Each structure stands twice: as C-alpha cells, then as structure tokens.
Amino acid sequence: MNPNNRSEHDTIKTTENNEVPTNHVQYPLAETPNPTLEDLNYKEFLRMTADNNTEALDSSTTKDVIQKGISVVGDLLGVVGFPFGGALVSFYTNFLNTIWPSEDPWKAFMEQVEALMDQKIADYAKNKALAELQGLQNNVEDYVSALSSWQKNPVSSRNPHSQGRIRELFSQAESHFRNSMPSFAISGYEVLFLTTYAQAANTHLFLLKDAQIYGEEWGYEKEDIAEFYKRQLKLTQEYTDHCVKWYNVGLDKLRGSSYESWVNFNRYRREMTLTVLDLIALFPLYDVRLYPKEVKTELTRDVLTDPIVGVNNLRGYGTTFSNIENYIRKPHLFDYLHRIQFHTRFQPGYYGNDSFNYWSGNYVSTRPSIGSNDIITSPFYGNKSSEPVQNLEFNGEKVYRAVANTNLAVWPSAVYSGVTKVEFSQYNDQTDEASTQTYDSKRNVGAVSWDSIDQLPPETTDEPLEKGYSHQLNYVMCFLMQGSRGTIPVLTWTHKSVDFFNMIDSKKITQLPLVKAYKLQSGASVVAGPRFTGGDIIQCTENGSAATIYVTPDVSYSQKYRARIHYASTSQITFTLSLDGAPFNQYYFDKTINKGDTLTYNSFNLASFSTPFELSGNNLQIGVTGLSAGDKVYIDKIEFIPVN
C-alpha cells in the first residue's frame, strides 16, 4: 500500500556532480578559445546580455488579460451559490467593469490566444464577434440596471408593468447570448476564440440562474421557470465540453521537441487554465436548486510559471520538451510547501568579473493536507553543491511571490546562465504577517530579471499584495541545460482558495476536493482531472476504504450536515461514509458511464445522502463497494450541506 500515492513516478535520477574548477581565469585570455569572441570586450558582452535579457513574450497586454481572468474567478468564488440582495447586483457591476468597460478587453482576450498559437483570426470573424459582444454588453447593462431598480423598490410598488419590463430585458439578454455564442466558435477559429467563448458562456449561465432566483417575483409561470432551468443545465454541459475539447486541441498543437516549444506549450496551459478552465469549474455552482446557499469551494490544480533563465534564446541548450514534461510531477495528493534546500555551484567567466555562483539544484519538502505529520522529500533536481547548501523553511506559510536575479558568463566559448538570487514573499494568514526569505548565491548576483507577478498577477490591486495575491508556491524543480551550461528552475503554484485546514463552514455548502485526502488505500490513486473539476481526482479500482480526509468543523456553532459526493462510475456502487472509523451514512448509487468512456461533464453525478449527521470527529473515510474486475469509480469532491 502506498498511502500517500507518491510512487515511482516521483523518482528522478540524480546527475553527477561534474565539479567546476575554482581556479578560474580572472582576466581575458591572451588567445581567445572561440574566434567569435576575439574582439568582444567586457562592456560589449554586458550590452549583448542585457539586450537578450528582455522577456518580449510577457507583454503588459497579456498580463492585463490574465489579471482580468483571475479577477473574474476570484469574484465568482465570493458569490457562487445563491447570493441574495445587493450582492448579486454588486457582482454584475464589478464584472462589467472588469471585462466590459469597452471592447478592448475582448480584443485582448483574442490577441492573447493568437499570440500563443501564432495564428490570426480573420478580420471578418473578429469583427463579427466584437459586434455581437457590443450588443451583449448593451443588453446586460440594461438588464442589470433594471434588476438594481427592482431590488431597491419596495414590494408594494412592484406592479405588472414593472414585472413585464424586467422580464422583457432578461429575455432579451438571455436570447441574445444563445444567438451570439456561435460567433465565438467559428469553424477553424475555435481555439483562438476560446477565452472569449468561456467568458461569454460564463456570463450567459450566470444570467440564466436569475430566472430561478427571481422568476416567480417577475411573474413567470412555473413552466417558464422550469424551461429556463432545463436550458441552463443543457448549456452548462454544452459550454463545458466545448471548452475542454478545444483547450485540448490547442494544447496538442503546441506539443514539440525543443525547450522553446515547451515554454510556449506551458504558457498556453497556464494562461488557458487561468482564463478558461478555472472558470468552467465554477459553472455547476450557478445551479441554485442544487446550491441554495453560498458555496465555499477550492481550486487545487497546479500551474507552472516560465522557467527562470537569463536569456530568451538558449540556442538549443535549454534541455528538451520531453525532459521537462516527463519530470513534472504526475497527479498526486495535494500538498503544501515546507522547505527548499538550495544547492549552489560556481560558474567561472571568461572575463573574470562575470563569474558568479548560481542555483545548481534543489530538494523540496512538502507536507500533505492536514491530518498527517509526514514530510515528503523530493528526489534531487539538478547538480549538487560545490558551495554550502541553503535551507529555507516555509512551514505552510503562503509564498505569494518570487523575484529572481540571473547572470550570464562566457566560458570558455559559450554563454552560461544561472539564477543567482531569489526573494520569496510569504504571508501568514493566522498572524496576518508578511515577510520575506531569500536564496542568495552571494557572488555577483546580477540584476532582477524575473517576477512571478508578471505571470500570476493578483486577484485585486485594491489591497496590499499579501492580501490581494492570487497564487501560492507549492513546488520547485530544477533542470539541467544541455552541455552543462547551467540550470533552469521551474516553479509550481496553486490557487489561493485552497484551505489548509479543510474547514467546514456551518452556514455555507463546503466542497472539499478528495485530492486533499492525506491517505489513500489499496486500489485508490490520483489521476488527472478531466479539465473541468478544478484539479485532479481520485480513481478507485478495488472495493473497500478509498481515502481518508481530515475535516475541521466549525466548533463555534452546533450544526448538522448532509453529504454529497461528485462521482463517476462504471457500475452501480455503494458509498459508505465513516468518521474516525464509525460508519454513519451508506447508500447505493447508479452507474454513470461505460468502461472505456472518456470523462465528460455528464459522466459525473451527485451521490446524495439523506441522513443528517454531526461532525463529531475529524477523520472522514470514504468507502466504495460493488466494483467488479475492470470497474472504476472516480471521485471528485465531497460536499457538506448545512441542515437548518
């Protein structure tokens, strides 16, 4: 049994030390080993490296697009479920100010994907989409204005005329979305329009739910309200599957063999996660019949920032696509950054004063989700030290920013790159204190050339960064450049919504991804999520206890809950829930898929338990029975619904 599901795939062969001699040349050689460097003096070298140290692909426009996507998701996480009163109008207002102050954000959404795919949308298609978006903006603004007035007016002043007016504006906006969505999925441009499609789909679904909240007040017949609900369910599935399909198509097109192709591949994966996949993970929560209360949920997926390098064009020395992709961590139980041990080596320089020390390799230690005291230490990445090691301990504090210095040297006839210093900004949300820790190679550290905020901007700029940040660091890897020309660190981040303590809210519906379990039993493993779950999922192939997750109830309020499990299964099964080993809920649930089926939105169902329970313990076990040979059960989340 491998209780933490951390197995052979985490093993990376440690490279040999390949010590660099420290008796380096302090001044330029009388005879240059490389003829191309004969006439290159030190100032020219510095100018050359400075010119090559500008990251052209991370433009301010791209950063702004990503920030808007992150901001929309962050705002939604604060209102999903059933927001009452002014909270809904306030969200609409903020949302419109974010993505619809003009047509410029929508143009930027399109240009972002055009840059990633190195392909342009034809003018006719772009102009048609922008025209549709302008019409949608007008409709939505008119509807939100009417909704605001409706909420402000006393019930006694609401009459058939005002009811008819808001029904008219709602129906106009809703039907305009249905008619416009094909303009964001024009054949041949589906990938390039994907961010636009996802944002428009999100607005449509969020709008549709209002019929369930206000439909009766507005004077709709029950049959009309039911029809809107049926449409919402159908479009949630349609929009989700469209986004997943075309995300995958775009990602597959960018697979390559070189380091440069991996950088672009990873940028697409990261940026489309932030602007598309994170968004569609929230679509089901707009179903106010299933979620009649506010919802506390989390995004547990990982995103990787660009490698930290001192030059843009590594000219074939930046390792290979497969070398990086194959060694990225495979699906695993969620964990938190605990410690990084930095190894440092010396890089001599042809000009003497361009010599530097650099981050040559590292171990990283993590801790599983609450419930276990284990510390998991990674295999070694990179080259081991010729200098003293440095240990930075984070102990679960949230590292929300990394700023790196890099340097370059010529030795003896080629350019070497290294990361010389990294400042980590961290925040303790228990004490409300911000601080920094620094890896410092302590020799010729060069200039700042990389900042994680450029790629993972904050949710909001209205708060200090330690409060408004969007992501926290949870893993660090280091890859060797070809020809031993240095190392390339790559940092992994997760969303700030993740709750270390797995707190169960006594007033909200709490969703806990099962990937936050601290222990898996035989036959249970972590597999890649199907893109729309906000993270990876658990697969069970054997009968018995599947996973144990630690939960922290709200002890300030005595509350009972009902449980639901978001699952897919190839057979009819029985789920059993136990607290500290004592079963309290058990029921059988239907098969949802056939063996071999690809997981799509409709593959999953909710297993609802009717018997309320109190959280009298902390260790929640989920058991599965009813599986035969070849059967599989996939578990995404468990939900805790307060019983009033």
UniProtKB/Swiss-Prot annotation:
TM region(s), chain numbering: none
Keyword Transmembrane: no
Example GO BP: sporulation resulting in formation of a cellular spore
Propeptide regions on this chain: 1-57
Compositionally biased intervals (Basic and acidic residues): 1-13
Keywords from the UniProt entry: Sporulation, Toxin, Virulence
InterPro entries in UniProt: Galactose-bd-like_sf (IPR008979), Pest_crys (IPR038979), Pest_crys_dom-III (IPR005638), Pest_crys_dom_I (IPR005639), Pest_crys_N_sf (IPR036716), Pest_cryst_cen_dom_sf (IPR036399), Pest_cryst_dom_II (IPR001178)
Function: Promotes colloidosmotic lysis by binding to the midgut epithelial cells of Coleoptera.
Family: Belongs to the delta endotoxin family.
Name of protein: Pesticidal crystal protein Cry3Aa
